[in-house]
Amino acid sequence: MAMLRTDLEFSMLPQLGTRPVRWRFADGLVPYEEAVETMEREVALIADGGDELVWLVEHPPLYTAGTSANARDLVQPNRFPVFATGRGGEYTYHGPGQRVAYVMLDLKRRRQDVRAFVAALEDVVIRTLDMMNVRGERREDRVGVWVRRPEKPLLADGTMAEDKIAALGIRLRKWVTFHGLSLNVDPDLDHFGGIVPCGISAYGVTSLVDLGLPVMMADVDIRLRTAFEAVFGETTGEI
């Protein structure tokens, strides 16, 4: 596996007796307001002892602003709808061809460590990419998952170009996580041009198809579930 540290370091396996995580797909493109309402409802149920949930969706084109978003990074404010959200991070784009995984887990049943949870989400993406022979990497100073682009010109400081392939942004309530990750499968990468993604202008954005992999969303979903189970444990529900 590429860039994996010890399993113990990123393990977020549940306590004995914890029920499997529900794995659910949304039909069609989900409006962002509907997604937030669903997460709010599910988080309340989970905090009250309900089963945890991973909800896989695609959105219509939109931008979201995290709690650290700088208004200057919204380059084209009228291009798509913009939603303020309570997740961490800055501006990001969501749209068709991007797999968004809303991860709603009770860390009291696992490990009450926010940094470890974020690292575990990165690990899920890295494992997913590894199954498709793509080397994803994490950076200590940049949340998300990155791929090196040796075919591109070097950066101004002489280092190799890198593009972001997956973004992360989370929120917690009573130690229950929500929001989650977005993995670029085949979105319109031009749509990222309306923002400075995650407030980082020195690096670009890529997708699996942009890297030359003619994959379908269903192919990615299978690998994503396998990777998730390796890090977070058993799931149940739709195949």
Swiss-Prot record:
<comment type="similarity">
    <text>Belongs to the LipB family.</text>
</comment>
<feature type="binding site">
    <location>
        <begin position="87"/>
        <end position="94"/>
    </location>
    <ligand>
        <name>substrate</name>
    </ligand>
</feature>
<dbReference type="InterPro" id="IPR000544">
    <property type="entry name" value="Octanoyltransferase"/>
</dbReference>
<dbReference type="GO" id="GO:0033819">
    <property type="term" value="F:lipoyl(octanoyl) transferase activity"/>
</dbReference>
<keyword id="KW-0808">Transferase</keyword>
<protein>
    <recommendedName>
        <fullName>Octanoyltransferase</fullName>
        <ecNumber>2.3.1.181</ecNumber>
    </recommendedName>
</protein>
<dbReference type="GO" id="GO:0005737">
    <property type="term" value="C:cytoplasm"/>
</dbReference>
<feature type="binding site">
    <location>
        <begin position="180"/>
        <end position="182"/>
    </location>
    <ligand>
        <name>substrate</name>
    </ligand>
</feature>
<feature type="domain" description="BPL/LPL catalytic">
    <location>
        <begin position="48"/>
        <end position="236"/>
    </location>
</feature>
<dbReference type="Pfam" id="PF21948">
    <property type="entry name" value="LplA-B_cat"/>
</dbReference>
<dbReference type="GO" id="GO:0036211">
    <property type="term" value="P:protein modification process"/>
</dbReference>
<dbReference type="InterPro" id="IPR045864">
    <property type="entry name" value="aa-tRNA-synth_II/BPL/LPL"/>
</dbReference>
<feature type="binding site">
    <location>
        <begin position="167"/>
        <end position="169"/>
    </location>
    <ligand>
        <name>substrate</name>
    </ligand>
</feature>
<comment type="pathway">
    <text>Protein modification; protein lipoylation via endogenous pathway; protein N(6)-(lipoyl)lysine from octanoyl-[acyl-carrier-protein]: step 1/2.</text>
</comment>
<dbReference type="InterPro" id="IPR020605">
    <property type="entry name" value="Octanoyltransferase_CS"/>
</dbReference>
<feature type="site" description="Lowers pKa of active site Cys">
    <location>
        <position position="164"/>
    </location>
</feature>
<feature type="active site" description="Acyl-thioester intermediate">
    <location>
        <position position="198"/>
    </location>
</feature>
<comment type="function">
    <text>Catalyzes the transfer of endogenously produced octanoic acid from octanoyl-acyl-carrier-protein onto the lipoyl domains of lipoate-dependent enzymes. Lipoyl-ACP can also act as a substrate although octanoyl-ACP is likely to be the physiological substrate.</text>
</comment>
<dbReference type="InterPro" id="IPR004143">
    <property type="entry name" value="BPL_LPL_catalytic"/>
</dbReference>
<keyword id="KW-0963">Cytoplasm</keyword>
<keyword id="KW-0012">Acyltransferase</keyword>
